[in-house]
Structure formats: structure tokens, C-alpha cells
């Protein structure tokens, strides 16, 4: 049986990231925002326990625009989680970031505004969090340092543009997104990242580039291509996250834990 007080790290991923044969402890958490994507799982990394959640549900049955992001993040907060690693499949908008690349993005452009429930503060209290730097600087530092030490090549700076989906983009949309500064594209980082900031959870992303986006790829885009590339990269991503978790200091020294300070009237 786990000690809830000792589980401080969460991982949000898709199918395939958590496939160990060890018996897992299943945690069901109820929230005022409805049901999370699925029950949480307690995983063990050496002697460190982490709380894992499959963003799209146990059988990848929830499309990006239907994920209950508020319930998912609330569940982590309710459990006492202080840091979250988000894992993503993305498309590349530039030939400088080829399929198979592992990216630690540092910026976000959100094209889901107004389409998804994106805040915990809709009534009684108005909160405006500082989202200048959308990812935890401390986790990013340890991800990049760990990648260098264990010999995993990562791209250290990239802007992730989040779209609503579930359809893939047109070639004209991709050209536009590239022109406004996006490097990789996906459908799930928002409002996940900003909700984590609203509850003062540190959050960082590890993105796998599954394919070139529309108009850049010379071939039709397929889900099979995404799945195959993700499967090829999961070992490296899992190893990077596990080794990073082992190096994180117990006490957080970033600004994320004070995100609500001076954020409301």
C-alpha cells in the first residue's frame, strides 16, 4: 500500500507509456468537475511512487476536445501531486524537427480558447495566472540536463501550438501556424498546462514528433504512422522521465508553487 503523502509526481500520457507487468494499485478520485479520463494508477520508479493517468482513457476512447482536463488536473491536486510530466504525440511544422524527435517545448500557442473548459475560477473569484513561461523552469532544467547525461538527443526549445481537433489540419492552416511561430502541433496540451498552473502544480512536457504536418509531409497523414512512431520512441521517453524524476530535488524552488500569489483582485 502506498503512502499518499509520499506520492508527489504525476505523469499524464497516452496508451503504451505505462505498460509494466507489475501489479498496479488503481486509484479512483471523484471531482466536482466530473469523472477523470480513467482511474489513476500508482507506478513505482525504483523507490519513487508516481501517479499515472491515461489522458484519452484506458482504451484511447476519448477524443482531444472531449478530455475532461479540469477533472484530470483536479484529481492530481486532490491527491497531493506537486509535479506533472505531460507526454504528447505531435506533428512537426519544420523539416528541422523530423519524425522521431523528442522535444521539450518551452512555449505554447493556444488555438482552443473558448472551445474547452479552461479554468477552475469561473465563479465568485477571478484569477489571472501569469503564463509568460507556461512550463516549469525547474523540471525543464532537469529534463534537459538528464537527457544530456544519459545520451538522449532532445530539442530544447520549441513552440507547441494546440488546436481543437479531432480532425487533422489543412495545409493552409499549417502554413499559417508556422508563420506565427509554431514548431510542433498537437491537440491536448491546453488547457492541461494552464490548469496545472492554476492549482500551483509544476508542469513540463515531453513531446514525440510522430510525423510531418499537412503540406510538409509528402504522404497522406495516418493514425498508424503516429502509433508506430510513438511506439518506437516510448522506451527513450520513459527512460528520460524516470531518470529525471530520480534527480529532482524534493523541495520545489520554482515560481509555480506560488502561482496564485498576486493573481487575483
UniProtKB/Swiss-Prot annotation:
Binding site for phosphate: 15, 55-56, 188
Site (Important for substrate specificity): 169, 223
GO cellular component terms, A-Z: cytosol
Organism: Thermodesulfovibrio yellowstonii (strain ATCC 51303 / DSM 11347 / YP87)
Function: Catalyzes the reversible phosphorylation of S-methyl-5'-thioinosine (MTI) to hypoxanthine and 5-methylthioribose-1-phosphate. Involved in the breakdown of S-methyl-5'-thioadenosine (MTA), a major by-product of polyamine biosynthesis. Catabolism of (MTA) occurs via deamination to MTI and phosphorolysis to hypoxanthine.
E.C. number: 2.4.2.44
Pfam families to which the protein is assigned, alphabetical: PNP_UDP_1
The entry's keywords: Glycosyltransferase, Purine salvage, Transferase
Miscellaneous: Although this enzyme belongs to the family of MTA phosphorylases based on sequence homology, it has been shown that conserved amino acid substitutions in the substrate binding pocket convert the substrate specificity of this enzyme from 6-aminopurines to 6-oxopurines.
Catalytic activity: S-methyl-5'-thioinosine + phosphate = 5-(methylsulfanyl)-alpha-D-ribose 1-phosphate + hypoxanthine
The keyword Chloroplast belongs to this UniProt entry's keyword annotation: no
GO biological process annotation, one example: L-methionine salvage from methylthioadenosine
Broad enzyme group: transferase
Pathway named in the protein's UniProt entry: Purine metabolism; purine nucleoside salvage
MF-aspect GO terms: S-methyl-5-thioadenosine phosphorylase activity
Binding site for substrate: 187, 211-213
InterPro entries per the UniProt record, alphabetical: MTAP (IPR010044), Nucleoside_phosphorylase_d (IPR000845), Nucleoside_phosphorylase_sf (IPR035994)
Name used for this protein in its record: Probable S-methyl-5'-thioinosine phosphorylase
PANTHER family per record: S-METHYL-5'-THIOADENOSINE PHOSPHORYLASE (PTHR42679:SF2)
Membership in a protein family: Belongs to the PNP/MTAP phosphorylase family. MTAP subfamily.
Binding partners and assembly: Homotrimer.
Keyword field contains Phosphoprotein: no
Superkingdom of origin: Bacteria
